[in-house]
Amino acid sequence: MSSTPNKQAGYPRLVADIGGTNARFALETAPRVIEKAAVLPCKDYDTVTDAVRAYLNQSGATAVRHAAFAIANPILGDWVQMTNHHWAFSIETTRQTLGLDTLILLNDFTAQALAVTQTSSKDLMQVGGQKPVEFAPKAVIGPGTGLGVSGLVHSHAGWVALAGEGGHTSFPPFDDMEVLIWQYAKNKYGHVSAERFLSGAGLSLVYEALAAKQKAKPAKLMPSEITEKALSGASPLCRQTLDIFCAMLGTVASNLALTLGARGGVYLCGGIIPRVLEYFKTSPFRSRFENKGRFEAYLAAIPVYVVLSEFPGISGAAAALDNHLRNV
């Protein structure tokens, strides 16, 4: 992150969620008021600075002094080299080039975690559990392109998001079927992380492993095709795949809830679950989530929410920027 000593946190503020394919930009024009959202293809711009300038010109924004970018990358210092796109840049040099007083960067899933604190009840669908305990830790997990994992803990300064790489922890198979699937993945990849299964590619991997177990040679299917055939009843194998995927998610989510003591709730982000909402309510997820022996009652009380807001990375970046400006 980079700032000059400044002291008035003015609006509008520039907020962005930058992935390998698209960069989403918006202006925060007042506290929690997000306007003029736009999506720019990353491939159309040589540098992140070019993309920012194009958005600012398009939106007609003037006098922007503060900005925050959520980005699909670990943030380990001033230099950012995107892992899934060619953009590489210095945060401080970018701040100076754009004439900003403040520019902060944060991991995209850390931003999604912070967005949970800004999300209204209409953008949450509860799946089991009771009421959240106020100010208790919250767990945030998001199967999508990869598997994002974070947590939120409350401090005197507000909610703090935990930045980590929990999606790459080792996956724990629960039953004999999952052991077979895990063995298939281990033979293929060596280390089997939670993300190997709990992602778009992971859904395809579970499908592939089940087909191999049945000595079948099914057609190659995209994750969206697997879910479509599972929900329509067109493929029992796809339905079994989706059931196992949701059960696996229940295991990993409950492990995270126990680790954090997340009596403030578990929040499911990412692009996969919102596409199968009605199915998910009665999927194996919740029963697996609670299946923890002596801690079954503890987990049964924890509410799980599916986050439905469209651009959580944007609102999370705005929350991070606000926290930063309050504390400089």
From Swiss-Prot:
Tell me the Gene3D superfamilies matching this sequence: 3.30.420.40, 3.40.367.20
Catalysis performed (reactions)? D-glucose + ATP = D-glucose 6-phosphate + ADP + H(+)
Q: Which GO terms describe its biological process?
A: glycolytic process
Q: Where does ATP bind?
A: A16, D17, I18, G19, G20, T21
Superkingdom as given in the UniProt entry: Bacteria
Q: Which GO terms describe its molecular function?
A: ATP binding; D-glucose binding; glucokinase activity
Entry-linked CDD domains: ASKHA_NBD_GLK
Q: What cellular component GO annotations does this protein have?
A: cytosol
Annotated Pfam families: Glucokinase
The answer to keyword Cytoplasm applying to this record is yes
Q: Which InterPro entries match?
A: ATPase_NBD, Bacterial_glucokinase, Glucokinase
List locations, semicolon-separated.
Cytoplasm
| Entry keywords, A to Z | ATP-binding, Cytoplasm, Glycolysis, Kinase, Nucleotide-binding, Transferase
Q: Which family does it belong to?
A: Belongs to the bacterial glucokinase family.
Identify this protein by name: Glucokinase
